[in-house]
């Protein structure tokens, strides 16, 4: 996407960080109240670590593609899982989730960290996986996880078979 400007807004509100707008101008919102509470309980280093992680996540949203032909952003859908899983995969890939927070269980459709850790694990099978996965959102219509995995890894794989392999890896 043609992002020309990113506006970062630190606001005196409750709430979670979020990306707003569409290219060419994207906004990232962050709560100063959350920063204050976190600093009191965690100290400066942990707040800085978390803030950088949030920025990686939200900046990923600014640049990532959106799956075509499957509706829009709604929790529990493959569209939502793609969007939030990809953002957490990039965050983890860049060192802003501790590896010990990656646990067996859940489902690849859980989104956020669970999906993000799974997607990042797939970079061990193909170092260019995250880029290819993002690009698949334009190349496959209608898009689905299974179609994307087959597109990247070959017709013999399914998302479920890769998930089972990932779960076995986590249990080692």
Feature-to-residue mapping (PLM):
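Post-HExxH zinc-binding segment in Zn-dependent metallohydrolases
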Residues: 74-116
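Auxiliary, metal-adjacent structural segments of Zn-dependent hydrolase domains
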Residues: 1-29, 33
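Lumenal/extracellular "mature" regions of secretory-pathway glycan-modifying transferases
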Residues: 20-38, 76-78, 98, 102
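Active-site recognition of the HExxH zinc-binding catalytic motif
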Residues: 53-66, 84-88
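Pan-zinc metallopeptidase signature
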Residues: 115-118, 122-172
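Short pre-active-site segment immediately N-terminal to the catalytic Zn-binding motif
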Residues: 33-55, 69-79
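Surface-exposed patches in mature extracellular/periplasmic domains of secreted proteins
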Residues: 1-8, 70-78, 99-104, 129-136
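Solvent-exposed loop/turn segments at secondary-structure junctions
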Residues: 13-16, 34-37, 62, 69-70, ...
